[in-house]
Amino acid sequence: MDIVFNIETAGLPKDEILHLMPEFTAPSNYKDSEKIQTWKAKKQEEWFLDASSSALSGKILAIAIQEPFKNASFFADENEKNLLQAFWEYYRNHCTCRFVGFGCNSFVIPFLVRRSWVNRVAVPNIFRGRFLSGNFTDLMQVWGCGTSERTTLANLAKFFGLKYEPLETPFEAMWIVNRESALKTMERDVLAIRYIGEIMGVVAEEDFQWE
């Protein structure tokens, strides 16, 4: 059985990650102290805005899964440790299945594992040495066809003719103000992953209509 999955993340509060911020050094041609401080302030703000992209500075908001011929379901808990424990328990109960994602080998699984470590959550045996086990298929790697070419889920969905509108509100903000819309967005993404996987011949075909 092919199980499609994806995650959404958010940056941790500034006071929790400030000590992890790297020291930014302005280019050597910057001589004016005011310009140097402005440059550093900009880099620091960019770092905070990008906090959700690293397990050092971000956390898991929710995990979406979609089993064949079923609606998407979600692991969502304000307590990240509980969320991770629930997901890994689900994985253990379905470890003979294949988990299909987009960017899952390069981002999703590493993020889940690293956040599990910091939350002291036991991680199943999903590695073969330094590589992931064969349980995971990353459609971004499949798209690469042996090259390092990357793309986004949005671009690939559009490439294959899916109606995929960009978010007008950052997901993290949507999660706070409109949880229902946020979950619908996650459902859209896992269905897009399954549909793209079908086109690529990676995932068994389902009889569903893309809306």
Describe each region flagged by the PLM:
Residues 1-114:
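Conserved non-catalytic scaffold segment of RNase H-like nuclease domains
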Residues 58-77, 96-211:
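Metal-dependent phosphoesterase core characteristic of DEDDh/y 3'-5' exonuclease domains
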